[in-house]
């Protein structure tokens, strides 16, 4: 048997629920399983594949339970569906634990060498909600009960191998679960046709319904 939890589960325990959803849907969908056994397929995800109604996952400073679930949902999606997709940047979601200090913009993680991560080709940094209901698709959990440092952050500078500077200071001093998003887009070619697989959620700003011409 398994004596210890895999690192992914230790860092992002909510991912187990997402994995179980994929297993459940496939076990119940006999026709779907038959299709996949016989037809090669490509997939791309929208918010419903991560947790319903994710918006603003790249909106700097945004705080919302669903928004900061992006990387957990994306990692699980690649485990079950996206693993076969051609991608421009194969680097996975980076998820780990780090220390933040109230009033400081620095995030310190002694287990990660940030100089070896392609930060310029990765997404925004999320500090996770860290509640048992973080990935539950139920409006009653859309409250403010998550970790006080749980926001969408822009990485402004790699200070050294184990330290990042973020765009805004932490609210409280604590060890947090954080992740840095991946680039999930790709393309492939068949004869003279080129097909583009888009990532419509991973790097999306929050739309402004009052200013529909706003860039971003």
Q: Each predicted region: which residue ranges?
A:
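Short beta-strand-initiation
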Residues: 150, 181-183
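Short, surface-exposed beta-strand/loop micro-motifs that present aromatic residues
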Residues: 183-189
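Cys-His-centered catalytic/binding microenvironment captured across papain-like cysteine peptidases
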Residues: 174-180
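His/acidic metal-ligating clusters that form di-metal
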Residues: 209-216
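Autoprocessing Asn-cyclization modules and mimics
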Residues: 75, 82, 87-173
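Active-site neighborhood of divalent metal-dependent phosphoester/pyrophosphate hydrolases
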Residues: 1-103, 162-171, 192-205
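Intrinsically disordered, low-complexity acidic/polar segments
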Residues: 116, 205-207
């Amino acid at each position: 048997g398994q004596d210890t939890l895999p690192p992914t589960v230790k860092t992002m325990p909510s991912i187990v629920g997402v994995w179980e959803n994929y297993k459940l849907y496939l076990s119940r969908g006999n026709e779907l399983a038959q299709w996949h056994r016989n037809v090669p397929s490509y997939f791309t995800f929208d918010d419903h594949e991560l947790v319903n109604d994710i918006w603003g996952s790249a909106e700097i400073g945004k705080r919302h339970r669903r928004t900061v679930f992006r990387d957990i949902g994306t990692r699980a999606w690649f485990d079950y569906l996206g693993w076969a997709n051609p991608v421009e940047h194969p680097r996975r979601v980076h998820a780990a634990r780090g220390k933040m200090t109230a009033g400081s913009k620095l995030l310190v993680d002694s287990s990660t060498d940030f100089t070896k991560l392609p930060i310029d080709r990765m997404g925004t940094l999320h500090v996770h909600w860290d509640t048992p209901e973080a990935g539950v698709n139920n409006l009653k959990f859309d409250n403010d009960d998550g970790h006080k440092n749980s926001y969408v952050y822009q990485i402004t500078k790699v200070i050294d191998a184990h330290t990042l500077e973020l765009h805004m200071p932490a609210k409280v001093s604590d060890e947090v679960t954080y992740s840095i998003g991946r680039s999930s887009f790709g393309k492939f070619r068949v004869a003279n046709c080129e097909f583009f697989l888009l990532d419509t959620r991973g790097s999306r700003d929050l739309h402004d319904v009052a200013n529909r011409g706003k860039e971003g």
